[in-house]
Amino acid sequence: MQELGSRTLSVLAPRVGTVTISPSSAAELTLSERDHGVAARVLSALAGPDARLRADQERAVAALVQPGARVLVVQATGWGKSAVYWVATALHRARGRGPTLVVSPLLALMRDQVAAAQRAGLRAVTVNSGNVDQWSAIEESLRADEVDVLLVSPERLANPGFGRRVLDHLAGRLGLLVVDEAHAVSDWGHDFRPDYRRVADVLRELNPDTPVLATTATANARVTADVATQLGEATLVLRGPLSRASLQLAVLPAMAPLERYAWVAEHLPTLPGSGIVYVLTVADTARLVDAIRAVHGPDYPVAGYSGGLPVEERERLEDALRDNRIKALVATSALGMGYDKPDLGFVVHVGAPPSPVAYYQQVGRAGRGIDHAAVGVLPSGADTGVWDYYATSTLPDPRQCEQILGALAAQPEPQSVVALEASTGIRRGRVELMLKQLAVERAVSREVDGWVATGRSWRYDAAHYDGILAGRRREAAIMTDYLAGSRCLMELLAMSLDDPDAGPCGRCSVCTGALPDGWSTAPSQAVVATVAQVLRAQHQVLEPRKMWPGGASGLRGRITAGELASPGRVLVHTDAPEWAAARAGCLTLDAPPPPELTEAAVRALVSWRGQWSERPGVVVALAPTGLTQVATGVAAHLAAVGHLPYVAWPLPAAAASLESDREAAGAAQVQRWSELLTVPESVGAATAGRVVLLVVDASSSTWSITVAARQLRRTGATDVLPLLIHRRP
């Protein structure tokens, strides 16, 4: 007889201090013979005719059919958490109760869950940003009680329109509420999402008899306690061992950024089966795919994956990997929680995540249904800088929160994010983050027409957020120990999750003293050279900004055609590994550009000129970040090669500090750049009546380029073609 998964149960009531169901009473929870029949039908549809609930899964299901039950399941990937809520759903529906609401964090995860529920004989639907045209029909089916399972994202749960139309109707008659990946509810967790706190509001609005299940594979003792507290006093916590016997973990020696790309390209064909190569940024997904194809040819079966792709494209790529039609997806963390491919043969990380818990969650995609999967990480000294950014980027800034609350209090009507950006001078992304954090503490509320202050007093809890930051830094320290190979890798991951059963695995590169068969400690230099050559020949399109930010800038609405730059080109995009030496040298220290950078600029113009309406008539050098030697060096070289006149546009020293201000809103930047970027007489005379090739040293926001193009057009330039040497993160 087949059982779903192979983990044993540990009921850890004393560890979290919020559980009132004792281990002995939990052990007494069983299903009736009739319920076993329903469960058998669901499980046979999911996993074959011999599938049965194990004793630990049965206890969870038996608890969930009790009125008002609160259950938190912390079990390793592959244990069968989803089987618990599909069986519980079937039992509730058999009793004539309402549908199950599943809160799930990712579209990829929701799609897999819908497919699994449908295999189990349940009518499952999802409401998400990718199926807006189906919302009305889905809501009508819900009102007619024709849906067994509704899956939504936490962001959808927080949407006031959805709450009014759907949640208010369901709250009193839900059969079961499921919070998947529940560690995201806790701001002590590695993947806290403020919108998940909307779950607490749903709990308060629920019929108190509605059972609630929260599931995760990545919660340490503190996160477990926090989630259990939010669920309620009588929460039953079911927790099992988290080590994964099928995974062979390995840490490779530190390599230069380009060497990591080359290592993946060289070793990918030898890795078992199909798998995932995780990278830290969206830009890395495209660059690494190009590096792999540079070595193995343009038709090599590999593709990039990120949350920015259209839903249909993500689904196509997920299916291609699931069906082994491609060797690997090079992916950001958007392909993570819940992606279901039991025979995933490998996971390789190019750059380490900031948290061992996040790392455990991602490598947990591998080896779920096979005996062996290879897992490796290629660390870099640059990883710690990324970790520092993520440690603080989601924490509220008290000054910005007070500004936003003041702006809301000053207006009688709901305010949009755009309006708040303009009135506070805080950039849009930070406004959105602060609003979500303030909404968690109910200081603001999102209405249909915008955001309003609730009138509830708000105080920045410095001790709480200092504790969160300290916790994240402790996790980063554990990740540093992991990369240093200080002890068994699986044991260290399990210990980071407070697993009492953690112990040496006997399989990892620390336990064996060796890398997996066929893995080298460095790539061949020939492969490194091939990858460098191909990547340095590529250039990204720089799309011009088309709208003014409004606010203090005094400029609002669409940028007129007579003030607009044409699409440009970028030579070095963010942290491009092929340009690591230049980024550490002239693009940081303001030194003359190396020959490979000026040659790349010439190649960019050669490939770009087919899109020009007219050939440039003059080259202008502009250095808003103060890298004057870089801007003038590249501009002068291009002018000499193209036999064009060349002129430098000098800027005051204050310009560099403005370009480096990451917190300044667009309106504030445009206002200051408009003051700083007055066109000198020499530049105006050289550019009037001509197409300008504008060579810019570096920029992050590109507002300096937008304003410079406007000023040049207003003083007579017929067009502006920006060549941005370094697009900063």
How should each PLM-predicted stretch be described?
Residues 28-36, 41-45, 51-82, 87-93, ...:
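Helicase motor core with emphasis on the C-terminal RecA-like subdomain
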Residues 211, 614-626, 693:
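Short glycine-rich phosphate-binding loop at a beta-alpha junction
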Residues 706-729:
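PRPP-dependent phosphoribosyltransferase catalytic core
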